[in-house]
C-alpha cells in the first residue's frame, strides 16, 4: 500500500464543472502548496492524499489537504 498526493483542478464549463488535469506529488505538503498557488486560476481546486493498493484494487478514503472554490464531493 502506498499513499498518493493529488491535486485536482475544476473549471467552469457552461453551467457545470469540468475536471482538469490531475497532478500527482511526492508529498502532501507539495500537493497542498501547488493547489494553493493554482487556486485563483480555476473555479475550484482540491488537494488530497489517499492510500492505494493498486494490485488489490483497494482505495482508501481521500484526506483533503486544501480546498478552494467550487469542488464536487470526493
Q: Which residues are covered by each model-predicted region?
A:
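Short, mixed-charge low-complexity intrinsically disordered segments
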Residues: 39-74
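A short, charged, amphipathic alpha-helix used as a generic interaction element across diverse proteins
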Residues: 25-44
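A generic short-segment signal for beta-strand/edge and adjacent turn/coil regions
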Residues: 13-19, 32-37, 74
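Internal catalytic or translocation cores that form aromatic/hydrophobic pockets or channels
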Residues: 22
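Residues that cap or initiate secondary-structure elements
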Residues: 13, 29, 53-54
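Short aromatic-glycine-(Arg/Gly/Cys) micro-motifs in beta-strand/loop hairpins
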Residues: 1-19
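Residues in well-ordered beta-strands of folded domains
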Residues: 8, 26, 48
Amino acid at each position: 500500500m502506498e499513499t498518493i498526493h493529488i491535486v485536482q483542478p475544476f473549471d467552469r464549463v457552461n453551467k457545470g464543472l469540468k475536471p482538469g488535469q490531475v497532478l500527482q506529488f511526492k508529498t502532501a505538503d507539495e500537493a497542498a502548496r501547488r493547489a494553493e498557488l493554482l487556486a485563483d486560476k480555476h473555479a475550484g481546486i482540491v488537494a488530497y492524499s489517499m492510500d492505494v493498493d493498486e494490485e488489490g484494487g483497494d482505495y482508501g478514503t481521500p484526506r483533503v489537504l486544501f480546498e478552494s472554490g467550487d469542488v464536487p464531493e470526493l
